[in-house]
């Protein structure tokens, strides 16, 4: 199989498990050297790197806690060092903003601190990651933000998360216009309910799963690999004419 991303470098945030790991594995399979970030789960990041290397790919992991605003410059210092050692350059071709934490924070339960924590990871971090990446990102590069169907469809148990993801959609559109002269494409991928470790408790509720499946045109919840496939297309040469779009990959959730 032709490796469409051979010679490219990619940064995928929040890739120790779930959708982020699936994206990292897919981009590596397609030939990219992948830097993946993790926060709480070093073991998960190590497993992701090992799986990529076992499949013949190249990857390395960097710790990053995006609640802390000092993390972004530290991340890029470490990324620069690692890429320069490996490639002789800190050039970056693909950026995937995926990092997250628990988004299940109800309206009545939210406090200023918990609101700030969610917004720091889901909104502030992607903004400043892109800002820091631009000096390294090649002309013709790719920025792919992981949004959510919750940005446009009511999810009453996660209003702060929904707010943040709506902001990501808007940021995507603004950046696409801003970076068009450099032929950098900027898109968002908005998953619906997807089978990951992060929502295992919900998946163990058969009634909830049935309700979600009933609201989905294709009649089931998604798999991380299905989100990764959309990201891989946008990262490839074939995706070069798509920019400023939020692509919902939800199996037709709440059509």
Regions found by a protein language model. Give the residues of each.
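Conserved glycine-rich cofactor-binding loop
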Residues: 9, 16-17
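Substrate-binding pocket helix/loop in short-chain dehydrogenase/reductase
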Residues: 106-107, 111-116, 212
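Active-site loop immediately N-terminal to the catalytic Tyr-X3-Lys motif
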Residues: 108, 140, 153-159, 181, ...
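Active-site helix of classical SDR
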Residues: 130, 164, 172
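Alpha-helical segment proximal to the catalytic Tyr-Lys
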Residues: 135, 177-181, 240
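Residue(s) in the substrate-gating loop at a strand-loop-helix junction
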Residues: 148
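Short C-terminal tail/terminal secondary-structure segment
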Residues: 153, 232, 243-255
